[in-house]
């Protein structure tokens, strides 16, 4: 009798816990995205949108030095946005006539449709569409990319190599800390869980918060160059914009695409004759030294490489903007 009464009280306790947890969970899942900081708000309001197949794509387009014909297009990484380039933006405008960056579909201030089959091919088509929108489809373009953007650049390079009409005419390509080789790429644990989580992935994306995000991202920065709390909040605010946290698992399918299309994308890098450069933060745990660099130099012996200081990691343009900019300008001025 005593045991039965104890079981009854335990069941009642769990019911009460459940009744309390349901509204708390509902409130948690409907927490609004954080407000944009003044700097991030300024970045958004100074940008523009264009429409690609009914979807709004955010971009920045600055006119820089007068009299120069040079154009540079910046392709950002995962899971952030074009705001990754803000520390070197002014420096680029002193060298280029046009400095252009976009938020890929599913990133930043661009639309984040769901469900949607996000692909590198679509992102490359969006870049081409943006340049047509700006009337630059027949101009020679310098590409500067990072991480996820490196893969998009590889697809653009493949299309350029095919010499098809309507494709970009690429003058040069500079990559940085991207997993262009599947065999040397080391994704984070959270990325693995979201990419291959199946029915669990949508639950994980809904439960993701600033604490989980910041603890996951901070280790890919060097020990002396980690982002401040406010910088992390800026990154998180951009991800949460348009419920971007809910499409992260879909965006991560690019890792599988990279394996499937390795021959196409690595082959494009190895076979073109344009100047190619790589800026490398050697402390990168995602593309580790020396395995990555050895394979890169073996596969692309004609490419030049800039290795930044030993403590610079996966986000070199944020961790060492001056070193990154100097390395890029050295490359651009070499041909």
UniProtKB/Swiss-Prot annotation:
It is found in: Endoplasmic reticulum membrane. Its EC number is 3.-.-.-. It is a multi-pass membrane protein. It is an enzyme of class 3 (hydrolase). Its main location: endoplasmic reticulum. Residues 71-310 form the AB hydrolase-1 domain. Keywords: Endoplasmic reticulum, Glycoprotein, Hydrolase, Membrane, Transmembrane, Transmembrane helix. Belongs to the AB hydrolase superfamily. GO terms for cellular component: endoplasmic reticulum; endoplasmic reticulum membrane. Glycans are attached at residue 163. This is Mesoderm-specific transcript protein. SUPFAM superfamilies: alpha/beta-Hydrolases. The chain crosses the membrane at residues 13-33, 63-83, 266-286.
């Amino acid at each position: 009798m005593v045991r039965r009464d104890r079981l009854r009280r335990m069941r009642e306790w769990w019911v009460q816990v459940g009744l309390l947890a349901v509204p708390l969970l509902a409130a948690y899942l409907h927490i609004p995205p954080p407000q944009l900081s003044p700097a991030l708000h300024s970045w958004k309001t100074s940008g523009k949108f264009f429409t690609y197949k009914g979807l709004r794509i955010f971009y920045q387009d600055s006119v820089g030095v007068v009299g120069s014909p040079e154009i540079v297009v910046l392709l950002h990484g995962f899971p952030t946005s074009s705001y990754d380039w803000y520390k070197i933006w002014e420096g680029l405008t002193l060298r280029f006539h046009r400095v252009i960056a976009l938020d890929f579909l599913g990133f930043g201030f661009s639309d984040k449709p769901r469900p949607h089959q996000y692909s590198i091919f679509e992102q490359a088509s969006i870049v081409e569409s943006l340049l047509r929108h700006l009337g630059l489809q027949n101009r020679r373009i310098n590409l500067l990319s990072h991480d996820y953007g490196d893969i998009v650049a590889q697809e653009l390079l493949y299309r350029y190599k095919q010499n098809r009409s309507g494709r970009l005419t690429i003058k040069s390509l500079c990559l940085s800390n991207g997993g262009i080789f599947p065999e040397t790429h080391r994704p984070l644990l959270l990325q693995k869980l979201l990419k291959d989580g199946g029915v669990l992935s949508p639950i994980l994306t809904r439960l993701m918060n600033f604490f989980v995000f910041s603890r996951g991202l901070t280790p890919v920065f060097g020990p002396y160059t980690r982002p401040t709390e406010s910088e992390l909040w800026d990154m998180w605010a951009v991800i949460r914009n348009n419920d971007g946290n809910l499409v992260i698992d879909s965006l991560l399918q690019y890792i599988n695409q990279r394996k499937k299309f390795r021959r196409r994308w690595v082959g494009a890098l190895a076979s073109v004759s344009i100047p190619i450069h790589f800026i490398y933060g050697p402390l990168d745990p995602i593309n580790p030294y020396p395995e990555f660099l050895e394979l890169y130099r073996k596969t692309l012996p004609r490419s030049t490489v800039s290795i930044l200081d030993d403590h610079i990691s996966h986000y070199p343009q944020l961790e060492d903007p001056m070193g990154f900019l100097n390395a890029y300008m050295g490359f651009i001025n070499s041909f």
